[in-house]
Amino acid sequence: MQEKITQFENFLAQLQQKITSTLEQSETSSAKFISDKWQKPDTPEQKLKGYGNSMIIEGGEIFEKGVVAFSRVHGDALPPSATAKRQELAGKSFIATGVSLVIHPRNPFVPTSHANFRIFVAGADTDNPIWWFGGGFDLTPYYPFEEDAIHWHQTAKNICDKHDASYYPSFKKLCDEYFYLKHRDECRGVGGLFFDDLNDKSFDECFKFVTDCANSYLDAYIPIVEKRKNIEYSQKHKDFQLYRRGRYVEFNLVFDRGTIFGLQSGGRTESILSSMPPMATWKYNWQPEPGSEEEKVYEYIKPRDWIK
C-alpha cells in the first residue's frame, strides 16, 4: 500500500506543476506562482505530521489570487470530520495526500474554479488498510454564460463516461448537494463533479479514474478563462463579484470538510486558509434589481441538467 500511495503522491506533484505552469501562460502580467514548501515536525505532541508545497499567485491581471496546494500528512488518529460517516474508523492511524486548488480571477466575467484530488488510507500500518479516493471540480460564475457551464459539464461527463456511465449523474448530484449553503438556500455555483469514499472498483481502476479526472481540469477551465478574461467590466460588476465571493468564504468556513479536517487535525493554518479570496464584501439584506445581470446568476446556480 505504501508503494501505491507514493505513486499517487508523485502524480499529484507533477499535476501541481502542470496546473501552475499552464495558468501562468494565461496570466498577462509578470505575476507567477511562488512555492512555499513546509514540513510538520515529527514530534509526539504534534497531532498531524507530514509535508507539503503551497503554490500561490497574487496580484495578477488575470488571476487576482490562486492557490494550488499539495500535501502529504499522517497522524495517529483520524479527526472527527473524517469519521463522521465511518464510526468504525475512529481512532485509526491515517495517511492523506492530495492536491487542492482554488483560482480567484480578477475579471468578474471569469468564474472562480475549485478542484481537489486526494486519497485517504486508514490503518496503513496494519494488514488490512482501508483506502478511498475523493475529489472533483466545480465552477462558480459571477456573470454566467450558459455555453461555459455546458462546456464545463460536458468535459466532466466525457471523462466519467470513459470509466463508468453511472459516474457523471451520480457525482454531479453529489456536487450539487455538497456545494450548498443551507443557511442561504443557495448552491455555491453551477457544480461539476464531487466524489468521496470512492472505492467501488479495484485500487488501480479508481486510481486511473481520479488521475484522468485531475488531468481534465485544465481542459474544462482554461478555454473559459481565455474566452472571458478580456471582457471589459465596470465597478458595479466588480462590486457584485466581491459580494458573491462572500458566499465562497461562508461555505469554506462553515461547511467545507477539507477546511474542517485540516483545522481539527492540527494542519497548517496558512495553507488551509490560502484558498480564501483576496477581497470579499457583505451587504445587509442586499437584493439584485429585478431583470438585472446580477439577478440572472441566482437562476444559474440552481441544480439543472446542463447536458441536453
Curated annotation (Swiss-Prot):
InterPro entries linked to this entry:
Coprogen_oxidase_aer, Coprogen_oxidase_aer_sf
Active site per UniProt: H114
The domain of life is: Bacteria
Keywords associated with the record: Cytoplasm, Heme biosynthesis, Metal-binding, Oxidoreductase, Porphyrin biosynthesis
**Signal peptide position in this chain?**
none
Q: Where is this region: Important for dimerization?
A: 248-283
What is the protein's quaternary organization?
Homodimer.
Name of the protein in question? Oxygen-dependent coproporphyrinogen-III oxidase
